[in-house]
Amino acid sequence: MVGKLAVSLAGHDKGSIFLVIREDGDVIWLADGISRLYQSPKRKKRKHVQLVLNGGMDSSELEDLFQNPADADTKIKRCI
């Protein structure tokens, strides 16, 4: 699920598109590079988001994202 795009289904950010940057059990962390940055991602329950079928990052882009967090927000914005 990490690297996929997701749409928020509940909360004040309902309808917003995010990139899944981390997951842990029933909780995922989302970033959009604008209001939710890579350094301070949004924590959301899995049932409150829906994955987008097309889009996201492949494994090489994700590795680069995690190794170089200084440019992470720009890369996330481009992906969305």
Model-derived segments and their meaning:
Residues M1-V2, L9, L19-I80:
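Ferredoxin-like alpha/beta domains used as RNA- or RNAP-binding modules
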